[in-house]
From Swiss-Prot:
The lineage of its organism: Eukaryota, Fungi, Dikarya, Ascomycota, Saccharomycotina. Pfam families: ERCC3_RAD25_C, Helicase_C_3, ResIII. NCBIfam families: rad25. One of its GO terms (biological process) is transcription open complex formation at RNA polymerase II promoter. The modification Phosphoserine is found at residue 752. ATP binds at residues 386-393. Its cofactor is Mg(2+). InterPro entries: ATP-dep_DNA_Helicase, ERCC3_RAD25_C, Helicase/UvrB_N, Helicase_ATP-bd, Helicase_C-like, P-loop_NTPase, XPB/Ssl2, XPB/Ssl2_N. PROSITE patterns: HELICASE_ATP_BIND_1, HELICASE_CTER. Its main location: nucleus. It comes from Saccharomyces cerevisiae (strain ATCC 204508 / S288c) (Baker's yeast). This is General transcription and DNA repair factor IIH helicase/translocase subunit XPB/SSL2. The gene is SSL2. ATP-dependent DNA translocase. Component of the general transcription and DNA repair factor IIH (TFIIH) core complex. When complexed to CDK-activating kinase (CAK), involved in RNA transcription by RNA polymerase II. May have 3'-5' helicase activity alone, the TFIIH core however has no 3'-5' helicase activity. Also involved in transcription-coupled nucleotide excision repair (NER) of damaged DNA. In NER, TFIIH acts by opening DNA around the lesion to allow the excision of the damaged oligonucleotide and its replacement by a new DNA fragment.
Amino acid sequence: MTDVEGYQPKSKGKIFPDMGESFFSSDEDSPATDAEIDENYDDNRETSEGRGERDTGAMVTGLKKPRKKTKSSRHTAADSSMNQMDAKDKALLQDTNSDIPADFVPDSVSGMFRSHDFSYLRLRPDHASRPLWISPSDGRIILESFSPLAEQAQDFLVTIAEPISRPSHIHEYKITAYSLYAAVSVGLETDDIISVLDRLSKVPVAESIINFIKGATISYGKVKLVIKHNRYFVETTQADILQMLLNDSVIGPLRIDSDHQVQPPEDVLQQQLQQTAGKPATNVNPNDVEAVFSAVIGGDNEREEEDDDIDAVHSFEIANESVEVVKKRCQEIDYPVLEEYDFRNDHRNPDLDIDLKPSTQIRPYQEKSLSKMFGNGRARSGIIVLPCGAGKTLVGITAACTIKKSVIVLCTSSVSVMQWRQQFLQWCTLQPENCAVFTSDNKEMFQTESGLVVSTYSMVANTRNRSHDSQKVMDFLTGREWGFIILDEVHVVPAAMFRRVVSTIAAHAKLGLTATLVREDDKIGDLNFLIGPKLYEANWMELSQKGHIANVQCAEVWCPMTAEFYQEYLRETARKRMLLYIMNPTKFQACQFLIQYHERRGDKIIVFSDNVYALQEYALKMGKPFIYGSTPQQERMNILQNFQYNDQINTIFLSKVGDTSIDLPEATCLIQISSHYGSRRQEAQRLGRILRAKRRNDEGFNAFFYSLVSKDTQEMYYSTKRQAFLVDQGYAFKVITHLHGMENIPNLAYASPRERRELLQEVLLKNEEAAGIEVGDDADNSVGRGSNGHKRFKSKAVRGEGSLSGLAGGEDMAYMEYSTNKNKELKEHHPLIRKMYYKNLKK
């Protein structure tokens, strides 16, 4: 295997089964969809603003205004990356008035829609056979997924636009500057993009969209970032662009003196004339849509001109620590930096003896994602997004086998490091002595000229004093050129503590892998200049329908708060409220019922809780094993092995340490009793724990995902926000308001008022620290860590709110006084006598 382009594909249900009306019956109407909420909210907003008397959300019957807030967070990486490009996009798209015909007469309702009134757009006579519509104002694309041309159109749109929402029948995309950069990087020409959009659109493509596409693609590829002898150089073939960069107030001062001098413009122009003389232009025939489709689907249209075969004639050097600043500034001035690696012609770095084993098979979607990265003998830096359980690791391994240079892999935890090493040895011919591991427990280096190193973000990003062995390995990593770097769970890279690893390690090609390209801090757009554009994003529903991942039934179970708990909930502080709705007795009973129900079906069940106190209480009450951050490694392995291979252990409780670091393909049911507020990423990562089910290809099989939510609490708002990412991927959450038969199960927990009052008293006695969320032990969670990636140690004294009962020993604490003199006397006695003395003292 020499290139991904040479691959040949090996091969080219019902989501909600009938489980009985008694089980999934609902006493209330289904909740309104996001579209209905937005529509009702917009209809009433103007009226409410005129009166200024009450909240607009209250005018929508049965809806709360916090649901409206989910609209801003429901969109994925596309909207996050667009936030930084708003000014540029608006400048290119603002001139939409030129698209309105002169003879257009607004009707009586045009004023209600204002800028969203597109009644002036004229449908084409054959619009029924065309699958998409493009908004002239913001570049949003609506695709009919039931159209005969939908499959080809999806492959095209994923290349040129960002997927926003992809439910069953209607998909939404958005054209952004970054998505167009990615399209040009895989070989598409500007005219080809406009031509195909025009042929697929129900209405003529607006002039504003055409100008936006031309403006975003005209400057791509004119500035390159290359690595020579472990030094970074900015290169360009045009003298005016070089002069502009050097005169820039940000980039100019970052230039450092080197022996690479800029050639005179006359020489540059003469070389350009010699290079381009006699070369025919190669454009895809606009009349041949199939040719353009094949060019997009294939990933590269094999351009005849080899304009990159010779070295750039203009260059200047920048320092390693300035790489991020320069790349970001180039994005801002509309000259995005191109990072391509001509690995076939790189004879300076030694080759790595690595190939896929003959038994290794690449799935079609994995091959398609790799074709976006490789083309024309070059490797492009960028990001590939695949759902959990879809084989992201194998994609990275295949890319490493294609480049055949030294590889470094960065993961989020030491557990992931060992998994990556094991996967490399399983799927390819790499020898164990060429595969090194760099963690807190293992500090290895390969002894040959080239090899593989697997490490964590925390180990590389650490800025504290290192041990001798650790510093020796770090010098080894930073003192050489790497052909390829794989960034697992790449969504953690924008964090302040980890983004420095991108420039610390000098790598020619970068590949970011993730299932959830979302962050709650809107820093996901930084990946466009830290790593590169998004090269490919798979459709979760499509992979599920083809059997590559499991079909999942998602449900939100509403658990009413008992009267005693809700009364205390209304009067307590925010942190104590969290503990009350997590320890809701009705939620406990629902969890117990679902565990018993699915154990009878033969399912393997995982129960997730971010709150350690609740995790222990639930698990001990039900007699189930549990794992959290303080669980010893050996005990973890024993519990996981029994869960996988012991028929008597069918349920385990996990804290957030199981979100990403634990691979349990046997799990078929997941129950979530507490979570990390409104984190969309965590919701998708937890769903991924059951997407790897081994029986996913069995007819009629489904995996089950339950989110238990205490009704009429803040948890309902967080739950709606968390589901936004999965809803955009096409998943539907069924609302269950009552579990029939729950009251009749034997040994129902907290069935009597007395038991519920005792539980409430125990919860109220707990201090607010018990309501906290466990800090993860991996790089995927930056909470509780310092700027260098190390865990923050608790201080001896913590300032916080308290009560007089706590000072008086009323929080389940006892006061004990010891006599120092008596203790000294007891030291001279036999240990048995000392034990009897202390025993009597406690009585």
